[in-house]
Regions:
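Structural recognition of the beta-strand scaffold that forms the well-ordered cores
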Residues: 33-37, 44-45, 100-103, 124-126, ...
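Non-catalytic, well-ordered alpha-helical segments in soluble enzyme domains
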Residues: 154-155, 323, 332-365, 369
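Histidine-centered active-site microenvironments of extracellular/periplasmic hydrolases
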Residues: 57, 290-320
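Bacterial N-terminal signal peptides
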Residues: 10-21
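Acidic, His- and aromatic-enriched active-site or binding-groove loops in soluble protein domains
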Residues: 127-140, 179-218, 222, 263
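Active-site His/acidic residue clusters
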Residues: 176-178, 224-270
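Short, structured active-site-proximal loop/turn typified by the sulfatase FGly-forming signature C/S-X-P-X-R
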Residues: 44, 48-115
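Metal-dependent active-site segment of extracytoplasmic phospho-/sulfohydrolases and closely related
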Residues: 34-35, 43, 264-303, 345
């Protein structure tokens, strides 16, 4: 009787685990995950390249001669234009991974926070659900625990989760005071206990560079600090946020939006190549690449975003790594949302975030290809 009762209890326990999803996620090849964001970079540029109506001074605010701007970024064919603007995204990510969000081909990616600006977007992607309380970029410390803070509680990731971003508000979005995550944000001077001449030069550049504004450091300065950190500290979970595409959009400088977008693509390639050249990252690292919100699509609306600018809810998501099937540009698929990013980040490193946080959206379907045993 005792043996039979024990067997029954064991069977019930196993059934409960399967029913409620408490079993651990299946492990794939990914051991390191990187979420990369280019702030306010529209899906239109991602999928069709430079907008011909904005390649001028009148509508695009360009200071660069129109002929030179067209030489750099214009081609008659949309596929050629987008590859010219984003050579890594279309030459590597699209060939070896997947990209969602081309609405002209039946792929919709969108935010669900109803606000379509930065803090609500970063909260949604990092915690897995929108929070109506967060209705301003000046909201203050995030009351929600992000997937990055959550992963940092696991022994295998503790102390190896980092936030690198150009915007100083990331300190609040990822709640630096509570989470204790390693962060390099805004114009905060990079600091190392044992400073090399290279480190001293970088600090000097931070101190002497003329600031675009007091909140956002230049993408290029952050990139140097980021690459050094990756080489020295070997983080396993990493967030990287680049801000210039949004900054120049608000300034109405479409020429510099394109320059920043092109350099963003270069920075992502540079980070990928750097990590793939390191044994601890080679063949075991996944990149998720996206934006926090879209923008308007008219001759003046492209400069702004938010509830009053139609289309600002539309985003794009790219995934590249050893567990992602090379399906390329996704077409005629179910819509995906910004809220799904948090659980997707966790799933790639074998953690079931949606089970732990029931409000969180599930992982993006089809990007994690792990054979079941």
């Amino acid at each position: 009787m005792q043996v039979r009762l024990g067997t029954i209890i064991h069977a019930v326990a196993i059934s409960a685990l399967l029913l409620f999803g408490a079993a651990p996620a299946l492990a794939g090849k990914t051991q390191n995950i990187v979420l990369i964001v280019s702030d306010g970079l529209r899906w239109q540029e991602i999928f069709t390249g430079a907008d011909p109506t904005l390649l001028n001074e009148k509508e695009g605010g360009s200071w660069l001669a129109e002929g030179e701007l067209r030489r750099r970024y214009w081609r008659p064919d949309a596929d050629a234009r987008r590859a010219l603007l984003f050579p890594f995204l279309w030459g590597t990510v699209a060939k070896q991974g997947q990209i969602f969000g081309n609405q002209t081909k039946g792929s919709v990616a969108r935010v669900t926070n109803g606000m379509a600006f930065s803090y609500p977007g970063y909260n949604e992607m990092s915690v897995g659900f929108p929070d109506p309380r967060i209705n301003s970029n000046e909201f203050g410390p995030n009351p929600n625990v992000t997937v990055f803070e959550w992963l940092n509680k696991f022994d295998e990731f503790h102390g190896r989760v980092a936030i690198y971003g150009t915007w100083d508000v990331y300190d609040n979005i990822f709640n630096k005071a509570r989470s204790g995550l390693a962060m390099q944000t805004g114009w905060t001077l990079p600091h190392k206990a044992h400073e090399t001449p290279r480190d001293a030069l970088l600090r000097e550049l931070y101190e002497t560079t003329t600031r675009f504004d007091e909140e956002d450091v230049s993408n290029s300065l952050l990139q140097v600090a980021l690459l050094d950190y990756v080489k020295d500290e070997h983080p396993r979970v990493l967030f990287v946020g680049y801000g210039e595409t949004d900054n120049w959009g608000h300034q109405g400088r479409y020429d510099l939006v394109l320059d920043s977008a092109h350099r963003f693509d270069h920075f992502v390639r540079q980070l990928w190549d750097t990590m793939q050249a390191m044994p601890q990252y080679h063949g075991t690292t996944t990149f998720i690449i996206t934006t926090d919100h879209g923008r308007g699509s008219g001759l003046t609306e492209w400069k702004e975003h938010g509830v009053d600018e139609k289309g600002s809810e539309n985003i794009w998501i790219g995934v590249l790594g050893p567990d992602t099937a090379p399906l390329g540009e996704r077409t005629h698929v179910a819509p995906v949302t910004q809220a799904q990013i948090a659980a997707t980040v966790a799933a790639f490193v074998g953690k079931d975030y949606s089970h732990e946080v029931p409000k969180a959206a599930p992982p993006v379907a089809g990007v994690l290809n792990i054979p079941r045993e």
